[in-house]
Amino acid sequence: MNPLLQLSCPLLLASQSPRRRALLDRIDVPFEARVSPADETLAPSVAPAEAVRTLARRKARPVAADRPSALVLAADTVVAHDGEILNKPEDSSHARAMLRRLQDTSHAVYTGVSLVHAGSDRTATAVETTAVVLGPLSDAEIRAYVASGSPLDKAGGYGIQDHTAPFFVERIEGDYYNVVGLPLRRLYRTLRASFADLLEASSA
């Protein structure tokens, strides 16, 4: 168990993302995963930072209402290029188009993190932003990567943690884990700022 993150109440992850689950496993924090019934529809005009902030809160609240004694964590990640949000590709053709757009340029990855403890009527939400630069990609490289199937369930059409990523990710400015889907340092700082009483280590 992580000595810096020992909670006095259950932690519920309101997410279906295997990457977020893997990150919490990696830092050795016990949690239960729940699927949030939240509607993730937003107006197309919503700015990226506000979109992830809104959706993270929206995902956390119904799960927290069912378990008021637990601390609920929800997150939402989007990729944005020139201010336009790029969600998960609809199909292989869409994924190839996304990668052609993102290759040899910079884009931003936004993740909203929301923590809700319904028992004490507290909510804390934060947004982390990371800049990512992809190198040039040939059409053959794009087709091969998309054919692997990996891009199809990822915002922006690529996964920073994929074994092929070192070949095309040129530079990252900011939190790597944010690009994976859960900014761990931001999560910890938000916990300490708003839920210090639930962190057993903080009172030791």
UniProtKB/Swiss-Prot annotation:
Active-site positions on this chain: 76 (proton acceptor)
Major subcellular location class: cytoplasm
Catalyzed reactions: dTTP + H2O = dTMP + diphosphate + H(+); UTP + H2O = UMP + diphosphate + H(+)
Family membership: Belongs to the Maf family. YhdE subfamily.
Designated name of the protein: dTTP/UTP pyrophosphatase
GO CC field: cytoplasm
Subcellular location: Cytoplasm
Record keywords, A-Z: Cytoplasm, Hydrolase, Nucleotide metabolism
Domain of life assignment: Bacteria
Family matches, as SUPFAM superfamilies: ITPase-like (SSF52972)
Gene Ontology biological-process annotations: nucleotide metabolic process
Required co-factors: a divalent metal cation
Known EC number: 3.6.1.9
Annotated NCBIfam families: maf
Annotated site (Important for substrate specificity): 19, 77, 161
GO molecular function, one term: UTP diphosphatase activity
Annotated function: Nucleoside triphosphate pyrophosphatase that hydrolyzes dTTP and UTP. May have a dual role in cell division arrest and in preventing the incorporation of modified nucleotides into cellular nucleic acids.
